[in-house]
Each structure stands twice: as C-alpha cells, then as structure tokens.
C-alpha cells in the first residue's frame, strides 16, 4: 500500500470544481493547506465569501475526491474565507487580467451562440420556451445560461425553481444554477413580487450589468428572455450583443402571428438575424389520438414566411409545440417539461427544436453579424 502524499491529495482536489465558477479548486487558489498524518488527511479550503451557498457542495465533493485515494484514512475538510486581496486576484484571473468588466459575448471571437427570445405580445409562452430550450440543451451536455431581460415581467427564477440569490466576488456576480443552467434575473434582487418601475436608461444599464458583471464562464448557448414587443430592451440587446439572433415565439392564431411579425421585423433596423420561429400552443392531442386546433392553425408558418420576405433570408419554422396542460403544470412547479417529461408530445417537440439549434451552432458557430444601431 503506497503512502498518502500531499501531491496525491492535491491531484485529487484538482478534479473538484467550484460549482459556480466551473473551474478546479486548485486552479482558483482555493486550497489553503494540506496536512497528511500517516493515512489521515486534513484539508483547509478557501471560500470566496462568508456564508457561501455552495459550501456544503464544495466540501462534500472535496472530501469524496480525497477519500477515493488508495489507503486513505480519516479525511477532514475545513474552510476559511478569502481576503479582499485574494478576491480581487480571483476576479482579475476570471476576467483574463482585464480590470474593467466587458461583455464577452460582444467579442467577435466569441463562440457562444446568443439567442434573444422575442414575441410580439405577452402570454404566448415565450419565457416557457426560453427555459425549456435552455434545460434541454443543458441535459445534452452543453453549457447554457439564461438572462431574464424581461425586467418588468421577470419569471425565469420561478420557472426554474431558483430561490438562491447570486453571490458576489468583489464586483463580479456569480449566478445561481438550476437544472444545470446558469441564470440571472432582476427577480433575484427584488423582494417578493415587488414591481420594478424604471425608465429606458435604467433598463439598458441593468441588461449591460447582467451581461458584463455576471461571470458566465465559457457558455455554448446564452438565451435572453426579452419582454414582449420592440421596446427599449430589444434595442439595448441589439446594441450590446450585435451577434444575438432572434427566436420568435407565437401562437397559431392570426392575431398573434401578425404582432409577432413586428417583433421579428426589428432586425431590418438592427441588422440582426432571425434564427427561426417557434409556434407554441399548437394542436392539442386528445386522449383518443385526435387533435384539436384550439387557437387555430398556421400562425407559425405565416410568421416564418412573412419574415423570410421582410428580411430577405430564409426564416425557418423550427417547430410546433402542442397545447399541453402539463407544460403549464411543470412550469408552475419549476420543473420544465423538457427534462421532467422529455418523451411527452410537448417535451419531445422542444427537444427536436433544441437539436436543430445544436446543428445550427455546429454549422455557423461564432460567425459575427453586423449592426446598424448607434450606441448611446
């Protein structure tokens, strides 16, 4: 039986990641000390802040990793808190040595696919589609984030059952994680159901901070849940993340489709790309296998066809999500149907759209788009 060494313990800890940052504890300077006394091991770790919500997860994972070493005896994990200087160094390291926060997704070399999920009107399931696509892609092994840009009507934390508040490392915000998805919302910063009463400049600043001050890490996909319509936030997103592509959500009825066209036609001014249209609340599948078009039919294809003409580029209908009460039930429970019932008609349809988005990313990942909007 080989003796336990400090090097072996450190190697074991290098396989443990900080769940918020997604990097090894050893790389983040979070291992304060390792003491080996025969087969017994004492490890002291640095936490980024006092009261770190991930403390039990970090210490538990560290203990489990060390206990896998052959011949190890008792393993004790204790914690300390980083100093202000250590937090500043960590922040600088995570930002690549850049002092001031920048928006990583605005970098032309960014390989993160950014989708702004939009609708012409409220109540069409835009937020539900956002979170379901996000968790579906996370379940496929991708690194995914959701930015709730619907400041007035924020709903993402509830749809993902996220009650954990973000933590801060110096002036960098660590987003909560739910269902494998990093998320940030103004709902994390207001008490209860308090309203947010802001004018346009404040909305712009909030979106800018969520993009720049939050540590998103190396995401494959970022979904931005926009408010309905074509107001200040839609313009801010076009200015701040020129490469963001639009996903338009509508329902089958003509009235909703006509309004959805307006949401997509903003790209004529911003020179963004419409990645596709999602038709929600399509035909309901009845117990006998027949279908019922509760809200009519054809709205999604109508929007896709019309936007193809307006933009001069093919805008596909990515999919039709059947009207399914369980989609609402799982949304209320914070357990999106895409992962709680992936084989259901709605869950399967969402999964197919997620697969199309993956294929699109693999074919044109990282290609920058132009922007014709004047920065404020």
Residue ranges: model-predicted function:
Residues 137-200, 204-212:
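Phosphate-binding loop that captures ATP/GTP phosphates
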Residues 1-32:
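N-proximal, solvent-exposed amphipathic alpha-helical segments enriched in charged/polar residues
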Residues 27-30, 48, 56-118, 361, ...:
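Extreme N-terminal, non-catalytic leader segments
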Residues 20-46, 321:
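Short edge beta-strands and adjacent turn/loop segments
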Residues 113-151, 264, 277:
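Walker A/P-loop phosphate-binding motif and the immediately C-terminal alpha-helix
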Residues 333-344:
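C-terminal boundary of histidine-terminating zinc-finger modules
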Residues 90, 205, 213-216, 220-329:
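Conserved catalytic-core segment of NTP-binding enzymes
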Residues 41-49, 115-117, 245-246:
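Short, hydrophobic beta-strand segments
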């Amino acid at each position: 039986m080989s003796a336990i060494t400090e090097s072996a313990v450190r190697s074991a800890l290098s396989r443990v990641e900080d769940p918020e940052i997604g990097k090894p504890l050893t790389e983040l300077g979070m291992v304060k000390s390792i003491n080996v006394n025969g087969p017994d091991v004492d490890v002291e770790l640095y936490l980024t802040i006092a009261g770190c919500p991930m403390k039990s997860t970090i210490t538990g994972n560290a203990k489990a990793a060390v206990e896998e070493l052959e011949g190890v005896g008792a393993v004790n994990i204790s914690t300390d808190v980083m100093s202000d200087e250590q937090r500043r160094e960590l922040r600088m390291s995570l930002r690549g040595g850049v002092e001031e926060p920048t928006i990583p997704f605005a970098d032309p070399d960014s390989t993160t696919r950014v989708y702004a999920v939009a609708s012409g009107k409220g109540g069409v399931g835009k937020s539900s589609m956002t979170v379901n696509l996000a968790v579906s892609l996370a379940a496929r092994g991708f690194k995914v984030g959701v930015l709730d840009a619907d400041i007035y009507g924020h709903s993402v934390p509830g749809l993902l059952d996220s009650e954990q508040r973000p933590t801060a490392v110096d002036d960098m915000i660590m987003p909560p994680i739910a269902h494998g998805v990093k998320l940030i919302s103004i709902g994390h910063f207001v008490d209860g159901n308090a309203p947010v009463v802001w004018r346009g400049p404040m909305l712009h600043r909030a979106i800018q901070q969520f993009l720049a001050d939050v540590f998103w890490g190396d995401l494959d996909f970022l979904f931005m849940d926009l408010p309905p319509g074509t107001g200040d936030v839609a313009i801010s997103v076009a200015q701040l993340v020129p490469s963001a592509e639009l996903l338009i959500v509508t329902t089958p009825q003509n009235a909703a489709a006509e309004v959805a066209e307006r949401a997509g036609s903003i790209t004529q001014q911003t020179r963004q790309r419409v990645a596709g249209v999602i038709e929600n609340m399509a035909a309901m599948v009845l117990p006998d296998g027949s279908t019922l078009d509760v809200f009519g039919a054809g709205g999604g294809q109508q929007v896709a066809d019309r936007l193809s003409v307006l933009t001069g580029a093919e805008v596909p209908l990515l999919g039709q999500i059947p009207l399914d009460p369980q989609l609402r039930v799982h949304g209320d429970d914070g357990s999106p149907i895409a992962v709680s019932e992936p084989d259901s008609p709605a869950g399967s349809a969402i999964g197919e759209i997620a697969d199309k988005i993956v294929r699109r990313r693999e074919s044109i990942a990282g290609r920058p788009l132009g922007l014709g909007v004047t920065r404020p």
